[in-house]
Amino acid sequence: IVQALRQRAEHACYGYNCDDPRDAGAFCGYWQRHHGVTIAPEQTYMLPCVVTGLKLAARAFTKPGDAIVLMPPVYGPFRQSIVCNHRKPAAAPLVSDAQGRYSMDYAAIEAQLKAGSRCVFLCNPHNPVSRAWSREELQRLLNLCLAYQAVLVSDEIHADFVYQPNHFVSALTLEGNEQCVLALAAASKTFNVPGLQQAMAMSHNAQLLAALREEGECAGVT
């Protein structure tokens, strides 16, 4: 990484940047090799960071005053991304057992969906409780989203920090994901490069990606 940055800096041209198709190709290849996610470059949208993706998703998939489901305790910008866009956080708190292992409260999630929420923010793997959600857990959540026609936005930035015997499962590999899943990821955590300001939105649903891109273009994300 350092060598590549030095080589780029020596180019001595620091004008405006534009999307390079090689970036998306490299990203898609990495996710295929490391996480078994089959995604094409045209099914991605480059972003400055994952939090930007959350904010754009709030605007793309809901209207002012709508509620978005989140599962506290969760990374602070989840709630902030909802509130700053004049949406309402609809909490479905995680529950823990006697050993301190956290699980999703599906009854609470469904109650919020029944009440009208049409978007769910998922942290996968979860920050801060360090849960790598199983395929069964994620599929059960997605099935709820499908039943209530809600969009599932999955923050997967910590995908590379899952160790044996646990396994990371991307929401993009679930049955039915092409109907309502948008995933967000970045190299910033894995390679300690948040200053490079590059993340990726991914979806097998062209309409979801187009809606996110439209909000990004309106917000000046280029």
Region roles according to the model:
Residues 39-44, 64-67, 178-181:
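Short acidic capping loops at alpha-helix termini that bridge into adjacent secondary structure
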Residues 180-222:
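PLP-dependent aminotransferase class I/II
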Residues 59-122, 135:
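PLP-dependent aminotransferase-like
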Residues 78, 141, 171:
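Aromatic/hydrophobic pocket-lining residues that form π-stacking "cages" and hydrophobic walls in ligand
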Residues 66, 87, 147-151, 177-179:
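A short helix->loop->beta-strand "cap" motif at the edges of active sites that frequently abuts
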Residues 96-164:
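Active-site phosphate-binding strand-loop segment of PLP-dependent enzymes
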Residues 1-49, 56, 108:
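N-terminal small-domain helix-loop-helix segment of the aminotransferase-like
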